[in-house]
Regions:
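Alpha-helical, largely C-terminal catalytic domains
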Residues: 1-142
């Protein structure tokens, strides 16, 4: 099979896999509804907030990088599940599950694309760059 077709197959396998993000319920109600928000709705809302709020950052922000970070930051929960404040799961245990999920999910992608998203997820987890800090602030603002 042609290399480009293999890459496209891998990309569409990844797209089908991340559709599962819609099944992960968060412990946040949807405004005006009596149901929990799911991870995909959360990511969409945060991404739009980033587009509109990034100009207010104290530091220059790469908006595309920040939006991408927001769109991928919870993909690991497809494997690890969403952990809320009173779940009883230790931070170490949750991080280990998320790390394993990140390796599997981003590992589905063609090597360069997978590495790029994995590194971006790690940057979010570290919370040290301007983009990661803005991402974390936007998440905490909801």
């Amino acid at each position: 099979m042609d290399e480009k077709l293999k890459e496209l197959d891998a990309l569409f396998d990844f797209f089908r896999e991340i559709d599962k993000e819609k099944l992960i319920e968060r412990k946040t109600y949807v405004t005006g509804a009596v149901r929990w928000e799911n991870d995909a709705e959360h990511a969409w809302h945060m991404a739009l907030m980033t587009v509109l709020l990034s100009e207010y950052s104290n530091e220059p922000i790469d908006v595309l990088k920040t939006v991408t970070m927001l769109l991928i930051h919870d993909l690991v929960e497809i494997d690890a599940g969403d952990t809320y404040a009173y779940s009883g799961v230790s931070k170490e245990e949750q991080h280990a599950k998320e790390e394993k999920g990140a390796a599997r999910i981003f590992g589905m992608l063609p090597k360069e694309k997978g590495r790029k998203l994995y590194d971006l997820w790690q940057e979010f987890e570290a919370g040290e760059t301007a983009e990661a800090l803005l991402t974390r602030w936007i998440i905490s603002s909801r």
